[in-house]
Amino acid sequence: MQETFKFLRCNSQGEAVEDKYSLETLKNHFVVRDEYNNLFRVFSSRDDFWEWEAAQPFEQKCFHEVVFGFLPQRLKFDIDFPVNKSYSNDNVDENVDDNVNDDDNVYDILDMIINVIMDVFYETYSLPYNINLTREQILLTDSIGLNKKRELKYSFHIILYTHSVLNNNEAKAFTSKVLENLPKHVYPFVDPQVNKSIQNFRIIGSHKKGSMRVKMFNEELADVFETSTTTKKSDTLIATPFETTCLPCIFTNVKETASSSCDTIQQSELEEVLKFAGTLCKNHCFLRVHKNLVLFKRTSPSYCEICKRMHDKDNTLILRVTGNKVYQHCRHDNKHSLLMGSLSGTNNFVETYVDQVMTKSIEVHESILFEELPDPQKHIYDESSMREYERVPTLVVKAQMKIGKTIQLRNYLQKYYGNNSISKQQTIRFVTFRQIFSKNIQSRLPNFTLYSEVTGDLDSYERVIIQVESLFRLTSTAEPVDLLILDEVESIFNQFNSGLHKYFAPSFAIFMWMLETANYVICLDANLGNRTYNILQRFRGDVPIFFHWNQYKRAQHDMYYFTSSRETWLNNLLKDLLEDKKIVIPTNSLMEARLLQSFIQKKFPEKKIGFYSSKSTAHERESHFNNVSYYWGLVDILIYTPTISAGVSYEDKRFDVLYGFFNNMSCDVETCCQMLGRVRELKSKCYKICLQGKQNYFPETIEDIEMFTLQKRDTLFQTISNHQLSFTYSKETGRPIYYKTPYYHLWLETMRIQHLSKNHFITRFINQIADTGAKVFILTGEKLETVKQYTSIKMEIKHQDYVNIASAETIDANKALLIKQNLKEGITVDQQDLFAYEKYKLLEFYAWHGHKITPKFVEQYNSFMTKQNYTGRVQISRGKTVYESLTMLQTQELNFHQWAMQHAEHHDLQYNYSFQSHMYAIMLLTKCGFKCVQDPNILTNEQLMAKLVDEFVQYDLSAVSFEFKLKKPNKTDPQTILKFINKVLGLRYGLKIHHNKGNYYIKNTKAGSLIPFVRQQIKQSPCVVSNLLPITETSSVKEETSPIKETLTET
C-alpha cells in the first residue's frame, strides 16, 4: 500500500506528505522520492516498497530513500570520482606499484578511505566502548558506468550496515572526523553533505534519471576489499528502526565526550612512538596518525601477540598513546593490549630506548643530504686514518675525532699552498667559532697569523685564523679569497645565533661574501648535518659539493651506560669516588655543576676539584685552557659546563671514567656530545650518562618554523576587531612583505636543530652516541641514601644565592652598566659585584628601587615564571580596556619590527614578540565567556562546558599550540580543552579558570598571586596598576595581599 504526494513539506501549491503525516507517524512508514515521476511515495512498510519496485520498468527505477535526521540511521559515505581525472599513485601510496591502470588507482584511494573510516570508528567506539567493526561489517555498492555525456564515472556507497547512530548530527560529526583524517588530495572525493536533516539516498537497483549507472552489489568489489558479501536489499537502507546495534551518542552529548577523551600525537612525538614498533615493522609500514593512535598498513602475514595467532588480512596493528605510555592494540581484540614503553620525560624511557638500541630494534643512524649526492661527488670509505683531500671548489669532510682530519688538512695546505706551489701567495682565511679553538689551530698551523695577536687591518695578512665575532676586521675586496676553511662548521653557524656579536652585521656580511665568492671552500665537522648542506646549496649552488666521509668507528671500544635516574647515577658516582677513581663530569646545567661540586666537596674534602663554567673568571679560563695538560693534571675530579667545547683537549691518560649529566633545557645534543670529547683518553673507556628531558612541542620543520615566525609578524600589520578579537588587514600598513636574507635562511636552519634537540633530546643523544660505534648499556646499581642529601645541598646553594643577592650592595645605573660592559668584553668581575648586578636587575625589572628586599623576595620574584606573568599583566593592563591594551602593544612591536627590518634584521629574528601570545590568550578567555583577565563573572558548569563545545570543536588550535609550545588538545573533549586553556593563561598571566562546587571563575596561580592587579600604586609589593574592570571583593587582590605582606616583612 502506498500514497503519492507532490511535495514533502507543506506549501500553497498542493498536497504534501507533511499535511497528512507527522514526524512521529512517519517513523513507521517508508518514504521514497520518485525522481522519474517527480513524486514522493509513502509505503506502509519496506516490504510493500520492494514488492512494488520489482514491478516497475527499468527506465523508471529512479528511487531514493528519504532519510529523516531525527531517526536512527546507518553511517554512510558517498564517494564520487570526477570524470577524466588522473589518479596518480604519487598522490596515493608510495608502496603502490607505478604501473597500474585507472581502476587500480581508484581502488587504492577507496581502500584508503575504508581504512580511515575503520580507524575513526576504532578510536571513537572500539576503545571507549568495546564495539568492534570489521571489513565484513562494511557494505560496498557501486554505480560505475557512463554518465549523460557518455564518459566513464566511478561512484560508490560505503555503508556500515550492522551499526547505527542516534540521528543525523551524530552521523555528520562522524563523517567530519573521517574527513579530517583523510589526505588533502582524497578529501574532495567524499561528499560531506549526505547527513542533512532530510536526506535523499539512492536505493539499490536504482539509477539517476537520464543515466544508466545502476547502484548495485558487486561481488568482485567485495572480494577485492574483503567487505560484506551480503545481497540483502534491506541492509543497504539507511533508516534503521530495528535490525542494528545503536552506537553511543558521542558528539551531541558533552558528558559522553569526556569519557572518550584523548590527546593528539604531535609530530615531535611521532618519531619516538614509531621506535616502539620495532620488529613489528617487518610486516607493517606506517600509515598515518589519528588522534592518539598510530596506524599501520599490513605488508605481509604476521603473528599477533595479543590474539596469539597469525593475521594475514586487515591492518590490525595499532599503537595507542595514553599519557606517556605506548600500548600495542589489535583490531580483533579490543579488551587486551600490550604495554610497549614510555615516551621521553618519563622515568623509564631512557632505559626502554637503550634496550631497543641494544637489541638493534632501532636504526640509530640519521642519514643526511650529503649521503644522497651522486657517486661522482662522494668519497666514502672506512679506514683508521684519513685519505688525501680532493682539490674541488666545495669540499665537505666528515669523520670522527682523532682520525686525522687536521693532519690531512696540513698536507692539503702544503701540497697546494706550500713554498713550491703556484698558489703559495694566495689568500687563506681559517674561520673558527671560539677564541681558544683559534689558538689551538695556530699551534698546529704556525705559518698562519692569529687575529688576536695583531691589531688593525687584517687584509694585509695572507693567512689568517679568525674567530667569527671578529670577522668585521676583514673587508671584501675585488678579488675573492682563494681558500676558506670552516673547521667545526656546524658550531660556526651556531655562533652566528649566539647573541655575542658586538658587530654582527659587518661580521656576517664578510662571512657570506667569503662563502659565496671563495675559489675553494673546505668544511670539516664530525657532526655534519643538513644545515651545512642547505646553506652550501643555497649560497654556493653554482659549483657542485664534494662529500669526503670516513666512516671509521673510532669509538667502537667505548662503553656508554645510560639512565634517567639521578639516584642510580649518583650512586655509581659515589661508588667510583670511594674507589679513588679520577672522574670527569661534564654537564649542560650550571646549577647541576655547582651542586655536584658542593656535594663532592662535602663527601670527599681531600679531593681536588677543577671547576669551569660561565662564572669562571676570564683570566682563569684563558690561562687554564691554554695549558690543560698542567692544570687538569692537578685535579682528581674535573667538572665543566658548555664553556668548554671544541679546541680544548686533554690528551693524557689520567682520568678513569666520565659521568655526564644532561637535559634538554640548555644547549643542543650536538654540543653535549662534543663536551664528552674534551678528555680524549679514559682509562676504562667508560661513560656513565644521566639524561633528563621533558616533552616539548616546538615546530621542527623549516616550513613550520617559517610559518610560525612570519605569522607573529603578520599579526602586527592587522587591525584588531573589538568584537570577538578577530583580525583584518589594516588599509594603512597593508600586508607585510618579507625579504628573506642569507641570515634569515641560516637562522631557520639553526632553529630547526635547536627545536629537534628540545623535542627529541634523549633519543637524538643516544642515537648519536650509538652511531659512533660505541656500545650502549643500561646503567644499574645499588641504592644508597644520596638523593635526600643531594636535594638538601641544592636547597642550601639556592638559599645562599638568595641571601647573597638580597644583602649585596645597592648600585646605581652607571655601575650596573659598567659591570654589564665588563662581562660582555670578557673582563673579570668580582663576585660581590656580580651579586650587586643581579640585585640591580631584579629591582629594575619590577621598578622597585629604594625598597629593601629579603632572601624570600629574591626567591619568589626572581623566578622565570613570576617575571613572565608580571610582564604579561603589565602589557595587558596598559589601557582602559583589553582592546586598548592590545592595540598599544601591537603598535609598539610594529614600530620595533619596522625599525629592525630597516636597520638590523638579526635583532628582529631574535626579538621575542609577545602581541600574538596575548591575542591568543585573550581570545581563549573570551571564548570561554569571560571579558578580560579581571572579570569577576562566575559561570556554571553547564555554561562553560557548552561554551567549550560550541566555540572550540570547529576552531583550529594549531597556531595557539605553536605559540605556547604546548601539545594540541583533543577538541571533542571539553575538559582537555580547559586544561589546555589554563596552561596558556598560566604561562601568560598567572591565571586559571578555577572549578569550585560546580562553578568556574578566574583565579590566580601560585606565581600569579605574587603580582596583584591594583588601581593605584602601592608600597607593599611589586604590583600591576590596572584600569580594567572594577576590582570586586571576590577578585584576586584580597586573597593575595596576605602572602605578599608576609614576604616583605620577613627578616
Swiss-Prot record:
Organism classification: Viruses, Varidnaviria, Bamfordvirae, Nucleocytoviricota, Pokkesviricetes
Similarity annotation: Belongs to the asfivirus F1055L family.
Keywords: DNA replication, Early protein
InterPro entries for this protein: P-loop_NTPase, Replication_origin-bd
Organism from which the protein derives: African swine fever virus (isolate Warthog/Namibia/Wart80/1980)
GO biological process, one term: DNA replication
Stated name of the protein: Putative helicase/primase complex protein
Function of the protein: May be involved in DNA replication.
GO molecular function annotations of the record: ATP binding; DNA replication origin binding
